[in-house]
Amino acid sequence: MRLITAILQPAALYPVQVALARHGITGMTVSECSGYGRQNGHKEVYRGAELTIDFVGKARLELLVEDAEAAPVVDVIVEAARTGQVGDGKVWSTPVDEVVRIRTGERGGAAV
């Protein structure tokens, strides 16, 4: 099993979700996060002082797939999220030793 994690522009979340659904992915976990990198932040004025806000809002998407599906799923995410602009995000795959569905006790692929 592989854990696919993607940090995306929030606006890319829906197109990625639709593309993954077309690929047969039926579930994922999404959370809000923030970070900074090459995109840099933005400036705001607070009480007359100009502040640089380094952290930019992002969406974090996580899903479990069988080993053979990892590369195709990463490709689907990249194609759906890519705009060509700085800040499009990152996607990576990490190995998962074991998965257990808490409700039933199923393990491995059956738990996903």
Identify what each model region corresponds to.
Residues 1-112:
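Positively charged, small/polar-rich N-terminal and surface patches that mediate targeting and assembly
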